[in-house]
Amino acid sequence: PTITNDGVSIAKEIELEDPYEKIGAELVKEVAKKTDDVAGDGTTTATVLAQALVREGLRNVAAGANPLGLKRGIEKAVEKVTETLLKSAKEVETKEQIAATAGISAGDQSIGDLIAEAMDKVGNEGVITVEESNTFGLQLELTEGMRFDKG
């Protein structure tokens, strides 16, 4: 069995019979996937927010609200939220800040420390690849230049 709290992993497993429910579930899956593609984190939050928007939107439409008016209101709210988030965002610059942020995201400070070390070695333009291993523990392997895997 797989144990996860990742929104994308959970969303991928949802299969519904009802065609209308299936469309809604696919919409939420797309929200989680886009969030993962763009941010790499926050998929559970995005999924919960999408579900709340759909629930409240349907409730308002059932109560007689204009669907286009709701859409315009949501778009204005998204603009304001985005603006506010960008104003409150802080640059993560130091190795310690990277380690703290990565540790929170990974749910494990030792992973955060390893990511910070990797970022320190490759710089902002470098590529970091995370792979599963048959061995126990964490390790950092640095490849300078280019690496081509067979295939």
From Swiss-Prot:
InterPro entries cross-referenced by the UniProt entry: Chaperone_TCP-1 (IPR017998), Cpn60/GroEL (IPR001844), Cpn60/GroEL/TCP-1 (IPR002423), GROEL-like_equatorial_sf (IPR027413), TCP-1-like_intermed_sf (IPR027410)
Entry EC number(s): 5.6.1.7
Reactions catalysed according to its record: ATP + H2O + a folded polypeptide = ADP + phosphate + an unfolded polypeptide
MF-aspect GO terms: ATP binding; ATP-dependent protein folding chaperone; isomerase activity
Domain of life: Bacteria
Pfam families: Cpn60_TCP1 (PF00118)
Residues holding ATP: 41-45
Subcellular location(s) of the protein: Cytoplasm
Keywords: ATP-binding, Chaperone, Cytoplasm, Isomerase, Nucleotide-binding, Stress response
GO biological process: protein refolding
Gene Ontology CC annotation, any one: cytoplasm
PANTHER family: 60 KDA HEAT SHOCK PROTEIN, MITOCHONDRIAL (PTHR45633)
Reported function: Together with its co-chaperonin GroES, plays an essential role in assisting protein folding. The GroEL-GroES system forms a nano-cage that allows encapsulation of the non-native substrate proteins and provides a physical environment optimized to promote and accelerate protein folding.
Entry's family note: Belongs to the chaperonin (HSP60) family.
Subunit and interaction comment: Forms a cylinder of 14 subunits composed of two heptameric rings stacked back-to-back. Interacts with the co-chaperonin GroES.
Record's protein name: Chaperonin GroEL
Gene name per UniProt: groEL
